[in-house]
């Protein structure tokens, strides 16, 4: 499987770069990760941390997807391209990365 700069693909790397280059944004996502960890619990098949990463990744995907302008505003082609790019992002990988940062030397 081909990767890009250590990430699953270019799209995943790009989202990470944009998050990491803005202190407010990274703080926001680390706080959201902490929240998901705090409300999660061990399940039959997943640990508390795994459960938190799953719900956190879904939250990230929804948050970014909701920010794509309606196709009426930017044209069908461009809306479709944005959705395709966001659909290629490995949200689970990113959620895992920011969950690690949230749990690093911090008592949730």
Q: Could you describe each region identified by the protein language model?
A:
Residues 1-108:
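Acidic interaction surfaces
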């Amino acid at each position: 499987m081909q990767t890009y700069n250590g990430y699953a693909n270019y799209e995943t790397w790009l989202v990470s770069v944009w998050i990491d280059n803005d202190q407010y944004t990274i703080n926001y996502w680390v706080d959201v990760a902490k929240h998901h960890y705090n409300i999660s619990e061990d399940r039959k098949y997943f640990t508390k941390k795994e459960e938190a990463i799953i719900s956190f990744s879904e939250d990230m995907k929804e948050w970014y997807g909701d920010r794509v302008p309606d196709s009426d505003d930017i044209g069908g082609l461009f809306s479709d391209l944005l959705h395709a790019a966001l659909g290629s992002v490995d949200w689970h990988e990113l959620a895992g990365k920011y969950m690690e940062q949230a749990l690093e030397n911090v008592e949730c």
